[in-house]
Design a protein with these regions (language model features):
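Electropositive polyanion-binding surfaces
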Residues: 1-280
Length: 280
């Protein structure tokens, strides 16, 4: 369709300060395909049973109908996690789910880091507007609610990628290769000058080794510099039909599944999954 051709041409939604250029028309991206409080929506769901150790004992990738109980904001969830009495009362029907969700996200995050996921410090900035005029630029600090959603999204993406890989179905993977040799050599030399030393072949460092290095600098004045230098060493993540794993996340299989409204690869993956579910 012409709509699909235009979505493919755009590839993704683009976010500017105070403005969005959507991949799909706003009637779809902000209404018919968007989650709305008290309104049923058709979805693809990944239902997971996750143990206290972060291991998934079973999962189900299925079509479903969901109805959002509340339209929340990151700020409101953060305030609930900080035990804001007004919001705890206002959202009394879901407050326990929010606390349970955050605790679960910490379990997922811990397991991923143990598997080699690198915890970079964000060097992004937030542009503060007032009547379309820039009034401030602040460092972006990831909140607890944002961490929680990110952990759940990464876990869903991981499960979907693994599901499709082991079924040997056509798929679009998000691959991230090992760091370039010359870049990692420069990084190793810099941190060794800071009295941190690596063992073994520096050109074949697993991601958990680099994560341990980064963790050793946490709380120090050197941490932002080390994190920034390590981030510059990383290769660019790419979309490919073959699976080679995601180095930065420490995952054997990974894809982009969770944002079909704003990323075309996610939309295409939803189509592939639905065809498989319907036996096509």
């Amino acid at each position: 369709s012409e709509l699909d051709k235009e979505a493919l041409r755009r590839g993704t939604s683009i976010y500017y300060p105070g403005k969005v250029i959507p991949m799909l028309p706003e009637i779809l991206s902000n209404d018919l395909c968007s989650l709305r409080e008290g309104v049923d929506r058709y979805t693809l769901s990944v239902k997971m049973h996750i143990g206290y150790d972060g291991e998934i004992s079973e999962y189900d990738l299925c079509e479903s109908v969901i109805c959002s109980k509340h339209r929340m904001t990151y700020d409101d969830v953060n305030r609930i996690l900080e035990h804001d009495e007004y919001l705890l009362d206002k959202y009394s029907d879901i407050k326990q789910m929010i606390f349970d969700g955050y605790n679960l996200s910490r379990v997922i995050d811990k397991k991923r880091k143990q598997s080699g996921g690198i915890n970079f410090e964000s060097n992004e900035a937030v542009i503060v507007l007032n009547k379309d005029k820039v009034v401030d630029i602040k460092p972006r600090i990831q909140s607890k609610s944002e961490q929680m959603i990110e952990d759940f999204m990464i876990e869903a993406n991981r499960v979907v990628a693994g599901h499709m890989f082991y079924l040997d179905l056509p798929m679009i993977y998000r691959n991230h290769d090992y760091p370039k040799a010359d870049r990692i050599a420069d990084f190793v030399k810099t941190v060794e000058d800071m009295d941190y030393h690596f063992r073994g072949n520096i050109y074949e460092l697993e991601s958990y080794v680099l994560n341990n290095c980064l963790k050793s600098f946490e709380g120090s004045v050197e941490y932002p510099l080390v994190s920034s230098l390590l981030l510059r060493c990383m290769a660019k993540a790419v979309y490919e039909t073959g699976c080679t794993g995601h180095y930065g996340l420490g995952l054997k299989e990974y894809c982009h599944f969770t944002s079909p409204i704003r990323r075309y690869p996610d939309l295409q993956i939803h189509r592939i999954i639905k065809e498989n579910l319907h036996g096509k």
